[in-house]
C-alpha cells in the first residue's frame, strides 16, 4: 500500500495515510521525463487501486461506460462511485473501501431491507442502506464512525448517524468525486489497448 501511495499520490479509498511531501519531488527527479503511456498508466492505476478493482473489473466498467450515453469518462466515474462498497466508504460507515467491502461480504449491510453481500452492487437513487439489527453489526459501524475523520458528505448522499442509515438521493455529480483524477486519460489508455 505504501509503495502505491508513494508512487501515485494520495488514495483515500485504499488507505488514510498520505505520502510525505518530499517523496513526490524525489520521484519526479529520479524518474526524469514521463512518457504519455506512463502518464495514462498511472491514472489508470490510481483509479484501480482507489476503488480496489482488478484489471478485468475495470475493463468491464470501461466497456459499460463506452456503450452508455454521455461522456465515457464521466459515466465510468459515476458507475464506480455508485458501487455499494464505495457508498459505505463515502457515508463514513467504513474507514477505507476494503473495510467497506468486508462489511458487505460478511453480510452486515442491508439495502432496502434485504441483505446484500456483493460489494459491486450498483446503488440507485432512493436506495436506503442500513445495518443488520444485530448488536455486532451496529458495533462495527459505530467503531468505524467513531474512529474515522468526518469529511464533508457528498450532496448525493444523506446519513442518519443514530440509526446507522444512509440514503442515496441521486446519481453523483462529477464535482463530488473523492479522487483527483483525469478520467479521460484512463479512457484513452483502454482505447489504445484494443
From Swiss-Prot:
Query: What is this protein for, i.e. what is its function?
Result: One of the primary rRNA binding proteins, it binds directly to 16S rRNA where it nucleates assembly of the body of the 30S subunit.
Protein name per its UniProtKB record: Small ribosomal subunit protein uS4c
Q: Where is the S4 RNA-binding domain?
A: 82-143
Q: Specify whether Ribonucleoprotein is a keyword of the entry.
A: yes
Q: Which organism is it from?
A: Bobartia gladiata
**Protein's gene:** rps4
Q: Where is the signal peptide?
A: none
The record ties this protein, via Pfam families, to: Ribosomal_S4, S4
Q: Which family does it belong to?
A: Belongs to the universal ribosomal protein uS4 family.
One Gene Ontology MF term? rRNA binding
Q: Which GO biological process annotations does it have? A: ribosomal small subunit biogenesis; translation
Protein keywords: Chloroplast, Plastid, Ribonucleoprotein, Ribosomal protein, RNA-binding, rRNA-binding
Q: Where does it reside?
A: Plastid, Chloroplast
Q: How does it assemble?
A: Part of the 30S ribosomal subunit. Contacts protein S5. The interaction surface between S4 and S5 is involved in control of translational fidelity.
What SUPFAM superfamilies has UniProt attached to this entry?
A: Alpha-L RNA-binding motif
Q: CDD domains attached here? A: S4
Q: Name one GO cellular component term.
A: small ribosomal subunit
